[in-house]
């Protein structure tokens, strides 16, 4: 893997600007709806990251569309192109289940990976850029930050790219997660985390171990790209997001202790919110336009009280919006798809490709191609996808095809479904499984069904009929026509 040349978000923006991948907008633009519309049009056109230098009513610039193309996601991970993200996936697969060296030569081959692991511990600083300016007590005022109000029916401005830092009572390592946060007032936010996410689990364990005590929380905004992407990558449970960021970056992640608690935050973050969650303090969150393309339901979530705001001089507020794909989460999903393939292949070597179509809201539908080896094999792979990584807990549909099908070509996939499937025999239905809270199509919030589709050629034991043979032109004729094709001049120049 390549080492990055940027230590913080500003270094990355300098690189993007040099490559023509950042557009500075000096025109006055309103964080209320206007930024969303501009960012959405830009993303759909494959355009650059946007730095709104003159937000209406604010002096702090707003960064949007940072990871609006898969290529910029790859750059953020220190890779030259999207395909190189396979290397990131191979490293994660190795860390998830490391293979012992089989001999001296194999040890030499594995040395680069072991060397990268040395960059995993964090580097703790006594002073840091993220604490150059400090607001405490009555000076804490979230309304001074140009937090975007993304859609007309949204309940309030919404923080979208905050890295929430928590630690459970019995854990050495911290958890970094990205959870949206509704603004309630000048020092109050609603922390919308689902019950299975790391931050929520830390909070549950804290409440059991320290009933009635305040739970420390920090939220970092505008961290370096390796740390941001580390928070959205399917890393092993035993590996911290800071450690993974160190692997990506090629050197240790620099952190600093919060002023009000013992949590450690990215030293180069643009803004850090410190505070606590009071057990039992809840508030109705939503509705908000989400990555599904719909407004979600209102539900109760914990309230995060902000006691300190620390920030860099001339801080930049990093933001995004979510909406019907494509949006920034969908683009991230396309890029991270390349990371997932080697991780799955480590556990299931028969898998040839794995694809999460962005129009399927990034994770709700998966297409798998495989080298089938025995009757019922496709169903085993379905179950494996649903159970191996918790990222696929909410995947509603899994389609399994043979390796002669291109998982990323709907023409191929639909042909396989319509010619190789019997709806009753080849469909697996499961009820009462975990489903995304945002999926209003499920009969009960958080609980719904899943469908697996076996679109592979059927083997003896799976069918009693003679199976069809695909039509393929003879290689001799194809070669002959290749030679005379230009002379035929059928399609013109």
From Swiss-Prot:
Keyword presence, Transport: no
EC number per UniProt: 4.1.1.98
Disulfide bonds: none
Cofactor(s) it depends on: prenylated FMN; Mn(2+)
Sequence positions that bind Mn(2+): 175, 241
Keyword field contains Cell membrane: yes
GO molecular function list: 3-octaprenyl-4-hydroxybenzoate carboxy-lyase activity; metal ion binding
UniProt KW keywords: Cell membrane, Decarboxylase, Flavoprotein, FMN, Lyase, Manganese, Membrane, Metal-binding, Ubiquinone biosynthesis
GO biological process, one term: ubiquinone biosynthetic process
Pfam family, one: UbiD
Family membership: Belongs to the UbiD family.
Protein name: 3-octaprenyl-4-hydroxybenzoate carboxy-lyase
Native species: Photorhabdus laumondii subsp. laumondii (strain DSM 15139 / CIP 105565 / TT01) (Photorhabdus luminescens subsp. laumondii)
């Amino acid at each position: 893997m390549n080492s990055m040349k940027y230590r913080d978000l500003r270094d990355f923006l300098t690189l993007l600007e040099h490559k023509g991948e950042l557009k500075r907008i000096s025109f006055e633009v309103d964080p209320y709806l206007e930024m969303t519309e501009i960012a959405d049009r830009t993303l759909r056109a494959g355009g650059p990251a946007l730095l709104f230098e003159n937000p209406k009513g604010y002096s702090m610039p707003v960064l949007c569309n940072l990871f609006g193309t898969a290529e910029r996601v790859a750059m953020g991970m220190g890779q030259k192109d999207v395909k190189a993200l396979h290397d990131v996936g191979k490293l994660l697969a190795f860390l998830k289940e490391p293979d012992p060296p089989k001999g001296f030569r194999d040890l030499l081959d594995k040395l680069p990976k072991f060397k990268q692991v040395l960059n995993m511990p964090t580097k703790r600083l006594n002073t840091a850029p993220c604490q150059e300016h400090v607001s405490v007590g009555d000076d804490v005022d979230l309304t001074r930050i140009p937090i975007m109000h993304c859609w007309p029916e949204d309940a309030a401005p919404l923080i979208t790219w905050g890295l929430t830092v928590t630690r459970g009572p019995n854990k050495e390592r911290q958890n970094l997660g990205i959870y949206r946060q509704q603004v309630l007032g000048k020092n109050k936010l609603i922390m919308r985390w689902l019950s299975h996410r790391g931050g929520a689990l830390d909070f549950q364990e804290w409440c059991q171990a320290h009933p009635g005590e305040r739970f420390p929380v920090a939220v970092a905004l505008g961290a370096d790209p390796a740390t941001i992407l580390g928070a959205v990558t399917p890393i092993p449970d035993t590996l911290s997001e800071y450690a993974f960021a160190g692997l990506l970056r090629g050197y240790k992640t620099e952190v600093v202790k919060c002023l009000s608690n013992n949590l450690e935050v990215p030293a180069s973050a643009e803004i850090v919110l410190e505070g606590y969650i009071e057990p039992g303090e809840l508030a109705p969150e939503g509705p908000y336009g989400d990555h599904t393309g719909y407004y979600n339901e209102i539900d109760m979530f914990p309230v995060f009280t902000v006691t300190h705001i620390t920030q860099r001089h001339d801080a930049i507020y990093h933001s995004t919006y979510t909406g019907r794909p494509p949006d920034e989460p969908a683009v991230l999903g396309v890029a991270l798809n390349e990371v997932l393939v080697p991780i799955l292949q480590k556990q299931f070597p028969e898998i040839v490709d794995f694809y999460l179509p962005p129009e399927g809201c990034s994770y709700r539908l998966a297409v798998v191609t495989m080298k089938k080896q025995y009757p019922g094999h496709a169903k085993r792979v379905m179950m494996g996808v649903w159970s191996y990584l918790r990222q696929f807990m909410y995947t509603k549909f899994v389609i399994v095809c043979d390796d002669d099908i291109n998982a990323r070509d709907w023409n191929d996939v639909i042909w396989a479904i319509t010619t190789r499937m019997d709806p009753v025999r080849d469909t697996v239905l499961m009820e009462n499984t975990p489903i995304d809270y945002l999926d209003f199509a499920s009969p009960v919030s958080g609980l719904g069904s899943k469908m697996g589709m076996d679109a592979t050629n059927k083997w003896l034991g799976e069918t009693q009929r003679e199976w069809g043979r695909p039509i393929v032109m003879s290689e001799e004729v194809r070669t002959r026509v290749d030679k005379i094709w230009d002379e035929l001049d059928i399609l013109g120049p």
